[in-house]
A protein has these predicted regions:
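A SIS-like phosphosugar-recognition module
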Residues: 8-9, 20-21, 27-349
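Glycine-rich active-site/cofactor-binding loop and its immediate structural neighborhood
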Residues: 1-19
């Protein structure tokens, strides 16, 4: 959201710490003034290890700058479904922003998890984002099947996966503002649909979702489009562009859109090639907060509809939880020299 809607005249700079990676931490805080920094600690359960260690590192950074006690409370807030989160961070209750326990992280941008975006982009922009998402919700509820955009995308994806045997999907936006959207889509679809057990508890035979990848369309023409065009693999593709530019450089935009439309034609399967591509094009009039909200909600609804078609629960992630458990055991087996009984010998090397 922030990458798509930020401007060159932004008043607040927003930075994200997600991985437990000290290099990332140093690069971000190295350019910050602790006395002008607000830290938003966001975690649904408040048990995610990466969030905890980053919060502790930030806390230490503030302390080393002489920020503690009541001053610290002016520099840190918590967003969580865990009512004890603020207390656990030694912060007052007014620094706590609650979210619902029943909303998964990948569906939570519309909640207080979006606080950072609201602060950086402004409340009016964030409200427009919500309004756009709500408009898509209304469309899903009211539009007939033949005109229901998320349903059409879901049915196309389901057909590509189960009938045509296409196991991967490539997202190619021809717009710098949507460059990182593929990372969000990866989590949204693959964490929601990557299950081998159905909602009824039975093992699923056949595919459940596709591998999601992609990149900036124009740049990717010079890297993996050769493979898409003439390789022997099969790929479904969403190719997206905005008709109106978000800048004043008309010549650049004309070239960009020409490339997008040309590639939409070029990537379609030809008789002389062995590959099979199923290409869908999405054209947006212009990218603003409302349209971005609608676009994100479009893919959210597509994903949940695919869950219904595949017969799986798109709102849990048991594989992720298992990995967290093993990570914790390995971390503490090393620190306390326990044997790490659930881990194989390679993990303990």
């Amino acid at each position: 959201v922030y990458q798509a809607l930020r401007t060159t005249r932004e008043q607040v700079r927003l930075h994200f710490l997600a991985a437990a990676d000290g290099v990332s931490f140093d690069r971000i805080v190295g350019d910050l003034n602790p006395f002008k920094t607000l830290v938003i600690v966001s975690s649904k359960s408040f048990t995610t290890r990466e969030t905890a260690v980053n919060a502790a590192a930030i806390d230490q950074w503030l302390l080393e700058a002489g920020i503690s006690g009541e001053d610290r409370a002016r520099h840190m807030v918590v967003v969580s479904a865990n009512k004890n989160a603020a207390r656990d961070m030694n912060l007052p209750e007014e620094n706590f922003f609650p979210i619902w326990k029943w909303v998964g992280g990948r569906f939570s941008v519309w909640s207080a998890i979006g606080l950072a975006d609201a602060v950086a982009l402004g409340s009016d922009t964030f409200r427009a984002l919500l309004d756009g998402a709500h408009a898509m919700d209304e469309h899903v509820a009211q539009a007939p099947a033949g005109e229901n955009l998320p349903l059409l995308l879901a049915l196309i994806s389901y057909w590509n996966s189960t009938r045509l045997g296409i196991e991967q999907h490539c997202f190619l936006p021809y717009d710098e503002r949507l460059r990182t959207m593929v990372m969000w889509l990866q989590q949204l679809e693959m964490e929601s649909l990557g299950k081998h057990v159905g909602a009824d508890g039975a093992l699923i035979e056949g595919p459940t979702g596709q591998a999601i990848w992609g990149g900036h369309g124009n740049e990717s023409q010079h890297s993996f489009y050769q493979w898409l065009r003439e390789g022997t693999g099969s790929t479904s593709i969403d190719l997206l562009w905005c008709e109106k530019p978000g800048h004043r450089h008309a010549d650049l935009h004309r070239v960009l859109i020409a490339n997008a439309k040309a590639q939409a034609e070029a990537l379609i399967t030809r008789e002389e090639t062995e590959c099979f591509n199923a290409v869908s094009t999405i054209s947006i009039d212009q990218l603003d907060a409302a349209r971005l909200g609608a676009l994100m909600a479009l893919y959210e609804h597509k994903t949940t509809m695919l869950g219904t078609l595949y017969g799986i629960n798109p709102f849990d992630q048991p594989g992720v939880e298992f990995g967290k458990k093993l990570s914790r055991e390995l971390e503490f087996s090393r620190s306390s020299r326990r044997d790490g009984s659930a881990l194989d010998s390679n993990s303990l090397n």
